Amino acid sequence: MRLNTLSPAEGAKHAPKRVGRGIGSGLGKTAGRGHKGQNSRSGGGVRRGFEGGQMPLYRRLPKFGFTSRKAMITAEVRLSELALVEGDVIDLNTLKAANVVGIQMEFVKVILSGEVNRAVTLRGLRVTKGARAAIEAAGGKIEE
């Protein structure tokens, strides 16, 4: 068996109905669109969320909240991901070099998820309480 020889089981796929191809097909003339009306026309139909002229739900409800711009440039890094970084001193630039965080990130917070198996020094990164305890238990330290 090879990927280029795979095919669906016999009878599993049905050919699509060819509409508008004569009255004998059962889907000729109006092709299942009915008579007249907006939906029978070429390009007919209404946009998503349109409620027939009634004020739509997305406009009846008030706006709320916002997207924090700082959250967009802040990354969370798991303890287990620190193993992907070479060297003992880990800072923002070494995380970017190891492709652990994206190049557009300006802040990093290390969270307790997984385990750290070597002594590392974190420099200039924010760390949660649980992650701090795990790093210090492994013999590492955190420098602000």
From Swiss-Prot:
Function text: Binds to the 23S rRNA.
Key words of the record: Ribonucleoprotein, Ribosomal protein, RNA-binding, rRNA-binding
GO molecular function terms attached to this record: rRNA binding; structural constituent of ribosome
A cellular-component GO term for this protein: cytosolic large ribosomal subunit
Biased composition (Gly residues): 21-31
Region spans: Disordered: 1-52
Entries under PANTHER family matching the protein: 50S RIBOSOMAL PROTEIN L15 (PTHR12934), LARGE RIBOSOMAL SUBUNIT PROTEIN UL15M (PTHR12934:SF11)
Listed SUPFAM superfamilies: Ribosomal proteins L15p and L18e
Pfam families hit by this protein: Ribosomal_L27A
Assembly with partners or alone: Part of the 50S ribosomal subunit.
One of the GO BP terms on file: translation
Homology family: Belongs to the universal ribosomal protein uL15 family.
Protein name, per record: Large ribosomal subunit protein uL15
InterPro entries assigned to the protein according to its UniProt record, in alphabetical order: Ribosomal_uL15, Ribosomal_uL15/eL18, Ribosomal_uL15/eL18_sf, Ribosomal_uL15_bac-type, Ribosomal_uL15_CS
